[in-house]
Amino acid sequence: RGILDLGYLDYSCNWGTHIALLYDQDSELLDFLLGVLHAGVITKDRICCLLPASIERPLLDAYAEKYPDNLASLKEPDFLQLSQDEHTSSFFNSNDLLAMSDLIDSLYYESQIDTPRAVRFILDIQQVLKGALTPRELAEIIFRINLAVCSKDWLQISLYDLRLIPATHLMSALEQNRFVFRK
């Protein structure tokens, strides 16, 4: 455990941190994600992303253009894990928060088996909201994520598209986050 380079400006934070990133333009989001992704590549962290395809493909293309020498690292199966929409509902289920915590634990401990690696997990909250959650249910999910990651070498970044998220959901979720960036 220790301090990690966030890959965004000159920010650093402790492992076990959950950061909310608020944005309203995809180009701003890509700049932030490129830095986080590259910092994870440099330190050989496991990177997991639950992003919509509209962000995922441009992110990988922009990374290939900006960091062509490091692109091979992203193609290693244990290095970058991209999960699509169908996995999101089973992973972030407000009806079974204990199972969600267990899935986070198993993902983390799987990354420790051969070569221990820290985890950088990027979650687009819109993927979670497809389950038609109430603001309170979203806040509970964020709270559970915080509990699950606080004792691990895990950086959790939750993305909030201000163009899409209802204000009541945003405020409920942000009450659970200690760190909020506005891009």
Feature-to-residue mapping (PLM):
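Non-catalytic regulatory/interaction regions at protein termini and inter-domain linkers
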Residues: R1-K183
